Amino acid sequence: MTDTDNTRPAEGAAQAPRQSRLHRLMGYLPLIAPVLLWAVPCWVLLHTGQHWPLPVTLAGTALFALGLVGMPLAMVRGHGRRQQDRAAIVGDTLLGTSWILFTWAVLLGVLLRLALTVADVGESQDRARIVTWAVLGVTAILLAWGYAEARRVPRVRRLDVHLPRLGAGLDGLRVVLITDTHYGPLDRARWSARVCETVNTLNADLVCHTGDIADGTAERRRAQAVPLGTVRAAHGRVYVTGNHEYYSEAQGWVDLMDELGWEPLRNRHLLLERGGDTLVIAGVDDVTAESSGLAGHGAHLTGALDGADPDLPVLLLAHQPTFVDRAAAAGIDLQLSGHTHGGQIWPFHHLVRLDQPALAGLSHHAPRTLLYTSRGTGFWGPPFRIFAPSEITLLTLRSPHLPTSP
């Protein structure tokens, strides 16, 4: 590929994205969420219609109280200044467990109890205990399954993407997308190596990583990220920053990826040429870079496209799907993103939809602009994936200028 270096500092503050509804809501969540996540299941399981023996009620209530106090403490110690990995693992696991308990305590506490009442099953206490055991059973099954889903090597998701401006020489171009690997407190160096081995079986022309490599600095997570250096691609490996890089010394991650042989596309583009046709491969920093305070970091699409022939098709890497509004305005052909994790733990996807224009998969956002949003290759925080499986994506680009090859 031909390098056209056009790295520029971020555009002015007027271009910074407006604070979303989800971000405003997040300001209150640290105070409200822990109480709701632990108090609601406690009430449903132990105090609504049941008459458990007093020791059971006291022990159960104490256990929920311990979770309410312990989860925030562990999260602060794990993700605050101290960055204690063991505390982070405990806090993240408690967060995922409480979310699942809360979700199913609410759903089964209302729907199952209503169904049992309509069916006139037993007395009130009998119905309450059925609900309790149902919630505990469903939670245990989902935790076990969700943990296995999170720790497994992702399945490969394959799809053809038709780009009207793609030249015939580029038909069949194989683009592999990995994103949101989130190397973190749980050591996943072996998992990382297996992901890279899977990518190498796909015979990619281009491999893309659209950010959120890790939770932690490059120095701290280096051993987990090093396998990325083994990834093979016929025409190159490209990378853009995600929001989590800006929580953990983003420039260190840019430097490490460069050391591992990846091209950091920081507001610049490359030219991929094959069969006499050319595809512009552009990338921008994550939108959060604009408020990170790091000199030279910021999402700058104009800089990324500076010098590119406007008649050529453009493949854009941008971590967050929300960037697609800018991409559509600039006439981008295809944007690749991650960030959403597909919600990761159902039904969190409803909150994600408040913040992002797409959750997962291929979507249209302008007459010419397509967006592919990956559910992510790894997981963030809680080591669970429930009804939102991880993925390695193989996109085969198709041109309208000749029949689709088999």
Located regions from the model:
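Non-catalytic terminal accessory segments
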Residues: 1-152, 404
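Canonical alpha-helical transmembrane segment with a positive-inside/aromatic-interface signature
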Residues: 125-171, 175-177, 183-188
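Soluble catalytic domains of enzymes that build or remodel membrane lipids, polysaccharides, and related
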Residues: 162-406
